[in-house]
């Protein structure tokens, strides 16, 4: 359990560090005088306190910088109104292309409409939106497949379980993952019971509070399915506090180094691993295909892989895939 405590403490410190760092970065970037030939691209993510989005951004940043261009980065901290304001601000600063992972797949629509009015192409990351006509290119993991893989592993472990689902109601990818999970369990014909679907925004602290409440409501929970690893870690903290972590199967999606270490120790059951490195590289490639008028794909789906204790050595625990 010591590994889990160190992992949780480190992630909580990261949330604070990233939040402070991104504010400083934003002020610095806006003050830079750019060469006239430099292209300026805007990027905004649900939250950069999630290492998944931080890794995607780092990969894009590296590619953009290597081309002598500039990436304006904004972190709305899971606030859609703030994200819309930041997008409008970047559009007014003259960005040539926008990369966005929306806080709310419906609520982001006004900002995307303004991008279209200004003729700024949009690359959507790890989500869908209410109006796909407002988006130039969409890059997502196989989110339905991620839920399906977690469900298949659960089916291989037990034919009967009481399950709670931790979701992010504003995220399209969250619903895809839970659809893949629940539909696969239903098709199995086994005795699986969904006790409750609880929205925690995919956030660590909210998931921890939600799990505390769920444990008070339900005397027995066999399985937790969390839509991302931040939510899974929050749930695991509550399960450990209650003394039932070792008897609860915990599934998630992401494939972070922290989660892989916990899987290696037998503390987390399995995760469907995304590849933020690959997503970031693909996004950067599409940026220049669009800006240079080259052919590009409008919909890119990146495969996911299941990671369990049985095959953790194949993936390692030292970094993202």
Where does each model-flagged region fall?
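Hinge/cleft segment of the Venus flytrap/periplasmic-binding protein
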Residues: 8-11, 21-30, 185, 278-321
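An alpha-beta-alpha
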Residues: 41, 60, 148-197, 287, ...
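Hydrophobic alpha-helical segments within soluble ligand-binding/sensing domains
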Residues: 83, 138-164, 175-176, 204-208, ...
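Hydrophobic alpha-helical
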Residues: 102-115, 181, 196, 200-260
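Flexible loop/hinge segments that line or gate small-molecule binding clefts
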Residues: 105-145, 156, 162, 256-264, ...
């Amino acid at each position: 359990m010591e590994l889990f405590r160190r992992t949780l403490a480190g992630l909580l410190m990261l949330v604070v560090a990233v939040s402070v760092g991104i504010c400083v970065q934003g002020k610095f970037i806006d003050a830079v005088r750019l060469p006239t030939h430099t292209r300026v691209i805007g990027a905004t993510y649900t939250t950069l306190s999630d290492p998944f989005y931080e890794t995607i951004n780092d990969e894009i940043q590296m590619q953009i910088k290597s081309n002598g261009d500039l990436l304006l980065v904004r972190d709305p901290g899971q606030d859609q109104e703030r994200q819309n304001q930041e997008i409008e601000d970047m559009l007014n600063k003259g960005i040539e292309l926008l990369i966005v992972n929306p806080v709310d797949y419906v609520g982001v629509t006004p900002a995307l409409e303004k991008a279209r009015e200004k003729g700024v192409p949009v690359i959507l990351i790890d989500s869908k939106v209410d109006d796909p006509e407002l988006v130039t290119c969409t890059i997502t993991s196989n989110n339905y497949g991620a839920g399906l893989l977690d469900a298949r592993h659960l089916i291989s472990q037990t034919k009967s379980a009481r399950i709670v689902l931790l979701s992010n109601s504003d995220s399209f990818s969250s619903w895809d993952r839970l659809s893949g999970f629940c539909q696969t369990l239903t098709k199995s014909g086994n005795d699986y019971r969904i006790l409750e679907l609880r929205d925690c925004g995919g956030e660590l602290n909210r998931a921890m509070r939600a799990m505390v409440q769920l444990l008070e409501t339900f005397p027995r929970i066999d399985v937790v399915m969390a839509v991302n690893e931040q939510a899974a870690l929050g749930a695991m903290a509550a399960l450990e506090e209650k003394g039932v972590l070792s008897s609860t199967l915990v599934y998630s999606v992401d494939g972070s180094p922290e989660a892989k270490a916990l899987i290696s120790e037998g503390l987390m059951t399995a995760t469907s691993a995304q590849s933020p490195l690959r997503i970031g590289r693909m996004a950067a490639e599409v940026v220049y295909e669009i800006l240079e008028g080259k052919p590009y794909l409008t919909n890119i789906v990146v495969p996911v892989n299941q990671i369990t204790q049985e095959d953790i050595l194949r993936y390692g625990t030292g970094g993202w895939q």
